[in-house]
């Protein structure tokens, strides 16, 4: 990817036990202004209004890379404006096949009660807790919602709280944001998809 700046995660390995929490908010980065564009207002035709473009989607195929990306967004003061996707085999799958992808059982998918139970445990006890460390602030996703179709199951989580900061501090810097986390698997494989968004409000 020509033109992309070298990320901190290229040189600094992820250490979940030594990530410094985000103690205080800061002003919105000046670079954010390049993501603002003008569009015609739907409510008042003929008038223009400024909107923030969606952040660039970054895609990953390893959990460590994805978590490093989330950590780096906090370090770069972009914790309230990012969008990452992860397509991976969860650790419990890799452990069961002893890190040999050819040994993954074809029954390891959304139709297996054991697979779903293990994935739900991984989401609640590992993924969300690790993302909270990487973000550096509180995540309040609660139980979430499970949406199921014939070939896919998705756990949907949303956090619209103050993330552990005071309302005064959020108002001072105009830093109000919501988080959306979707984790899904299909009936075709043990591969899991994660979509994680931080959206300014």
UniProtKB/Swiss-Prot annotation:
Main site of residence? Answer: membrane
Give the record's keywords alphabetically. Cell membrane, Membrane
- Give the residue spans that cross the bilayer: none
Asked if the keyword S-adenosyl-L-methionine belongs to this entry, the reply reads no
Q: Gene3D superfamilies, per this entry?
A: Respiratory growth induced protein 1
Q: Where in the cell is it found?
A: Cell membrane
Question: Family, per the entry?
Answer: Belongs to the RGI1 family.
Q: What is this protein called?
A: Respiratory growth induced protein 1
Species: Candida dubliniensis (strain CD36 / ATCC MYA-646 / CBS 7987 / NCPF 3949 / NRRL Y-17841)
């Amino acid at each position: 990817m020509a033109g992309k700046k070298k990320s901190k995660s290229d040189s600094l390995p992820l250490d979940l036990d030594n990530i410094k929490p985000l103690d205080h908010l800061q002003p919105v980065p000046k670079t954010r202004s390049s993501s603002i564009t003008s569009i015609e207002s739907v409510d008042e035709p003929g008038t223009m209004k400024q909107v923030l473009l969606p952040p660039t989607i970054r895609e990953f195929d390893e959990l460590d890379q994805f978590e490093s990306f989330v950590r780096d967004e906090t370090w770069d003061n972009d914790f309230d404006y990012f969008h990452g996707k992860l397509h991976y085999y969860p650790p419990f799958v890799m452990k069961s096949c002893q890190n040999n992808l050819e040994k993954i059982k074809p029954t390891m998918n959304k139709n297996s009660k054991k697979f779903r139970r293990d994935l739900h445990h991984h989401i609640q006890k590992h993924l969300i807790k690790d993302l909270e460390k990487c973000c550096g602030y509180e995540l309040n996703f609660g139980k979430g919602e499970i949406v199921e179709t014939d070939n896919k199951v998705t756990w949907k989580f949303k956090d619209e709280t103050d993330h552990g900061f005071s309302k005064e501090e959020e108002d001072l810097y105009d830093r109000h944001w919501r988080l959306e986390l979707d984790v899904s698997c299909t009936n075709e494989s043990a591969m899991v998809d994660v979509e994680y968004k931080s959206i300014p409000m």
